[in-house]
């Protein structure tokens, strides 16, 4: 179905001059072949229309002759049929109704007022799908990293818990040894005191010497206790 040529179709939508080696999109916009090549020089695809971002466009076989792909023919036939929600457009349809799976043209969308939430351009839907896929990949990577960190934290906590339990057992053992030593020394000191009390009075003639010897014995006992405690703490 050929469309009449007019002033708007005779100019390239990018350079606004007469198109050289014309390329016509399914949506009706015309471009120079060189302009389109420069426009998409750094893109890998998809390649929507540079003017309206329609995601389906074809190149003309001959200058001035519109492309007649199967998809374009189907859309033009749908546009020529009576529309349910508004007048049909003469250009290729740009939108698809996701709720009813039926095509809707740009003219019908403009006549309907604000864009309803169930209508969405195909190129925008594809772009959103890529963004969602990238977000999911990032979230999956973050989740895996968090699991690895959690596992490392649990392992470190288990190791430190083992160290604390070992130190606690060692401290209890040292405390029991020190307490038993003090009890033994106390009994030994009491026995020595009882022996001293049972000596005859003539052997206690010099109380100063006896008191000095007792002080020396007490000092040696305290020194022995202090050295033993330090040695246990340093183990």
Curated annotation (Swiss-Prot):
Result for mutant: residue 98 to K: Abolishes ubiquitination by TRIM7
BP-aspect Gene Ontology terms: positive regulation of cell population proliferation; positive regulation of DNA-templated transcription; proteasome-mediated ubiquitin-dependent protein catabolic process; protein autoubiquitination; protein K48-linked ubiquitination
Record annotation: effect of changing residue 223 to R: No detectable effect on ubiquitination. Marked decrease in ubiquitination, but no effect on subcellular location
Catalysed reactions, semicolon-separated: S-ubiquitinyl-[E2 ubiquitin-conjugating enzyme]-L-cysteine + [acceptor protein]-L-lysine = [E2 ubiquitin-conjugating enzyme]-L-cysteine + N(6)-ubiquitinyl-[acceptor protein]-L-lysine
Cell compartments where the protein resides: Cytoplasm; Nucleus
Superkingdom of the organism of origin: Eukaryota
Keyword Metal-binding recorded: yes
Modification(s) after translation: Ubiquitinated; undergoes 'Lys-48'-linked autoubiquitination in the absence of growth factors and MAP3K1-induced 'Lys-63'-linked polyubiquitination. 'Lys-48'-autoubiquitination leads to degradation by the proteasome, while MAP3K1-induced 'Lys-63'-linked polyubiquitination results in the stabilization of the protein. 'Lys-48'- and 'Lys-63'-linked polyubiquitinations occur most probably on the same 3 C-terminal lysine residues (Lys-195, Lys-223 and Lys-224) and are thus mutually exclusive. Other sites of ubiquitination are not excluded.
Record-level Gene Ontology MF annotations: ubiquitin-protein transferase activity; zinc ion binding
Residues in RING-type zinc fingers: 12-53
Pathway membership: Protein modification; protein ubiquitination
Subunit (UniProt): Homodimer. Interacts with JUN, independently of JUN phosphorylation. Interacts (via C-terminus) with TRIM7.
Function: E3 ubiquitin-protein ligase that acts as a coactivator of JUN-mediated gene activation in response to growth factor signaling via the MAP3K1 pathway, independently from MAPK8.
Name used for this protein in its record: E3 ubiquitin-protein ligase RNF187
Native source organism of the sequence: Homo sapiens
């Amino acid at each position: 179905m050929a469309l009449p040529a007019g002033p708007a179709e005779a100019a390239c939508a990018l350079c606004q001059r007469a198109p050289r080696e014309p390329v016509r999109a399914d949506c009706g916009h015309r471009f120079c072949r060189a302009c389109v090549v420069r426009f998409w020089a750094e893109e890998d695809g998809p390649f929507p229309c540079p003017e309206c971002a329609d995601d389906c466009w074809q190149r003309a076989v001959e200058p001035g002759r519109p492309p007649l792909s199967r998809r374009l023919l189907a859309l033009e036939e749908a546009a020529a049929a009576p529309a349910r929600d508004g007048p049909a457009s003469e250009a290729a349809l740009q939108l698809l109704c996701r709720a009813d799976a039926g095509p809707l043209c740009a003219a019908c969308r403009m006549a309907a007022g604000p864009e309803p939430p169930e209508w969405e351009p195909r190129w925008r839907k594809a772009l959103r799908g890529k963004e969602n896929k990238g977000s999911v990949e990032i979230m999956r990577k973050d989740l895996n990293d968090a699991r690895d960190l959690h596992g490392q934290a649990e392992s470190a906590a288990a190791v430190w818990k083992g160290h604390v339990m070992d130190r606690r057992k060692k401290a209890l053992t040292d405390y029991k040894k020190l307490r038993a030593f003090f009890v033994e020394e106390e009994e030994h000191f009491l026995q020595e005191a009882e022996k001293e009390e049972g000596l005859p009075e003539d052997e206690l003639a010099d109380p100063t010497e006896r008191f000095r010897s007792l002080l020396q014995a007490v000092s040696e006992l305290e020194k022995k206790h202090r050295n033993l405690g330090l040695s246990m703490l340093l183990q």
